[in-house]
């Protein structure tokens, strides 16, 4: 089957694969999932931008969609490693503990819980994890993600952000004009905006790098507070 931009935005194959992975694991095909990601990342980023800009509406975003992370690695490859082979799902605290991987740490239980929450929710924004009844699992893409080449990983993150309710607005704006990121974060207090700016910029950088790779012109992103 040949997958299209529309297929990616529909999430149909991903949803079906997640269902198989969770309920009929023996039927899950890593090769089929890898082929899907390779196909959708072979499509030009400009095609995804055009599709995103053509959408009649984009779902509203909330404060929960504005990323807060501590470690980009722990949200991506580290998360895939921590949750790999876990069939029963993990809580925020269990995720944080596995991400520390037996290292000594001084975090309080509350801090551990918050760390796990922030990293796994960011991983979910990037399509790598999913939540069922307050427990977290690797998605079908998360299962195979470490097997992919670095350039495919970066391209996947870039297009994933283009279907996110928060980032799609920011990225499409960057394609048209200089964009001030705090203007999209006004549902947060200014203090919280400043705390989350770095996290958001780390994810946006995937898109910037991909546009540079494909010679797509975009405008700068700024972080000015009025």
Model features per residue range: what roles?
Residues 3, 8-226:
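Donor-sugar nucleotide-binding helix/loop cap in glycosyltransferases
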């Amino acid at each position: 089957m040949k997958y299209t931009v529309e297929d990616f935005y529909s999430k149909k194959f991903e949803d079906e694969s997640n269902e198989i992975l969770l309920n009929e694991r023996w039927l899950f095909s890593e090769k089929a999932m890898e082929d899907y990601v390779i196909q959708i990342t072979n499509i030009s980023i400009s095609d995804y931008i055009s599709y995103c800009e053509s959408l009649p509406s984009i779902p509203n975003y909330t404060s929960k969609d504005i990323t807060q992370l501590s470690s980009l690695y722990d949200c991506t490859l580290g998360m895939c490693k921590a949750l790999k082979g876990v069939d029963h799902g993990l809580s925020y605290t269990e995720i944080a503990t596995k991400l520390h991987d037996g290292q000594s740490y001084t975090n309080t239980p509350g801090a551990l819980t918050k760390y796990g929450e922030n990293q796994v929710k960011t991983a979910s924004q990037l399509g790598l994890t999913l939540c069922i009844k307050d427990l977290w699992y690797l998605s079908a893409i998360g299962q195979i993600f470490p097997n992919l080449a670095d350039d495919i990983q970066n391209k996947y993150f870039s297009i994933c952000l283009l279907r996110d309710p928060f980032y799609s607005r920011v990225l499409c704006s960057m394609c048209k004009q200089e964009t001030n990121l705090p203007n999209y974060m006004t549902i947060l207090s200014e203090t919280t905006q400043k705390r989350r700016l770095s996290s958001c910029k780390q994810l946006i950088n995937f898109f910037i790098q991909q546009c540079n790779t494909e010679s797509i012109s975009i405008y700068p992103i700024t972080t000015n507070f009025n």
